[in-house]
Regions:
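Conserved tyrosine-mediated DNA breakage-rejoining catalytic core shared by Y-recombinases
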Residues: 169-205
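Short pre-functional
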Residues: 94-95, 150-163, 265
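Short, basic (Lys/Arg/His-rich) helix/loop patches that form interaction surfaces
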Residues: 142-144, 237-270
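Basic/aromatic-enriched alpha-helical hairpins
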Residues: 2, 6-79
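N-terminal DNA-binding recognition helix of tyrosine site-specific recombinases/integrases
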Residues: 49, 78-111, 160-162
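Active-site/catalytic core of tyrosine-dependent DNA strand-transfer enzymes
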Residues: 132, 196-250
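Flexible interdomain linker/hinge and immediately adjacent N-terminus
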Residues: 70-71, 106-139, 220-226
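Conserved catalytic core of the tyrosine transesterase superfamily
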Residues: 137-154
Length: 270
C-alpha cells in the first residue's frame, strides 16, 4: 500500500510538469479527429487568448492557481470582453484543468473559484421591419462586398433567421420541388422552408457560383472549407457594421441580428 502511494505520488510529481498548452493541444487534436471541429476551434481560440495574456509563455498545469486566473479575468475585461466572453474562456479552461485532474496529471487546487463562470442574459437585438426595408432598398452598387453582406443578411431573414454556418453549407441539391431542406449544424435538426422568389433573386445575383454549394460563401473546392466560412463571416459582419452606421443604427448590425429580427417580425404577425 505504501509502495502504491509512493508510485502514485511520483507519477503526479512528474505529470505535474505538463503544460496547459501541451495538454490542450492533445484535446484539440482529439476533438478534430472525432469530427467536433467547432468545439476544437473554441478550444484553440481560448488557448490563443490565454497565451496572449501570458505574453506567449506557457504555464505548468500545476502552477495554475486562483491568483493567475483572477489576473486573466482582469486582462479580458481590460480588453473589452463581455462577462459572457470571460465566462466562455474560463469554462473551457476549467474543463481542461478538471480533465487533467481526472487523469491524475495534477491535484485539484480550485483555481477558478474566484472568477466568473456564469451566463448573463443577453439583450436580443432586432431591427424593425421598416429598417429591414431600408436595408433592402439601399444602393450599395459602389461596394461589392457591402452588397454581398446585405444579400446574406436578407437571405438569412427570408429563411427564418438561418445561421450563417448553415447558409454556407447549403448545397444546391438541398433545393427540391420548391422546398429547401437542410440539417442545422448546431443541433442536427432537419428543417424545411418553402423556396420563395426573394431567395431565388439573391441566388441569381451570383451566377458565377460553380461549386456544389448554393451560396457563394465556400467557393474554392481545394481550400479549407471551415477557413473560407470563417473568413467570410468576419468580412460580412464587418461590412454589415458599416451599413448599420449608414442607417444610423445604435447597435452593431450583424448576421446575428437577422435571426432575431425574423423572430421579432414573426411574433408581431401573430
Amino acid at each position: 500500500m505504501v509502495e502504491s502511494t509512493r508510485v502514485r505520488s511520483k507519477r503526479l510529481s512528474f505529470s505535474g510538469k505538463k503544460t496547459l498548452s501541451s495538454f490542450m493541444q492533445v484535446n484539440i487534436a482529439s476533438l478534430r479527429q472525432s469530427g467536433k471541429l467547432r468545439t476544437s476551434e473554441t478550444y484553440r481560440a481560448t488557448l490563443n487568448s490565454f497565451m496572449k495574456f501570458m505574453d506567449g509563455k506557457d504555464v505548468l498545469l500545476s502552477n495554475m492557481d486562483a491568483e493567475l486566473m483572477m489576473g486573466y479575468e482582469t486582462y479580458l475585461k481590460a480588453q473589452g470582453a463581455s462577462m459572457n466572453t470571460v465566462s466562455f474562456y474560463m469554462r473551457i479552461l476549467r474543463a481542461t484543468y478538471n480533465r487533467a485532474v481526472d487523469k491524475g496529471v495534477i491535484r485539484q487546487r480550485f483555481p477558478f473559484k474566484h472568477v466568473y463562470t456564469g451566463v448573463e442574459k443577453t439583450v436580443k437585438r432586432a431591427i424593425s421591419f421598416k429598417v429591414i426595408r431600408q436595408l433592402k432598398e439601399m444602393d450599395l452598387s459602389h461596394s461589392q462586398s457591402m452588397e454581398f453582406a446585405r444579400d446574406m443578411f436578407m437571405f438569412s431573414f427570408y429563411t427564418r433567421g438561418m445561421s450563417f454556418v448553415d447558409m454556407a453549407f447549403l448545397k444546391k441539391t438541398d433545393l427540391n420541388n420548391g422546398m429547401l431542406t437542410y440539417r442545422r449544424k448546431k443541433t442536427g435538426q432537419l428543417l424545411s422552408i418553402r423556396w420563395e422568389k426573394c431567395m431565388q433573386d439573391i441566388v441569381d445575383k451570383y451566377p458565377g457560383n460553380f461549386s456544389t454549394y448554393l451560396l457563394p460563401i465556400i467557393i474554392h473546392i481545394r481550400k479549407d472549407e471551415r477557413l473560407q466560412y470563417k473568413n467570410s463571416i468576419c468580412l460580412v459582419n464587418r461590412r454589415l457594421k458599416e451599413i448599420g452606421k449608414k442607417l444610423g443604427l445604435v447597435h452593431p448590425l450583424t448576421m446575428y441580428v437577422a435571426r432575431h429580427s425574423w423572430a421579432s417580425v414573426a411574433r408581431g404577425k401573430h
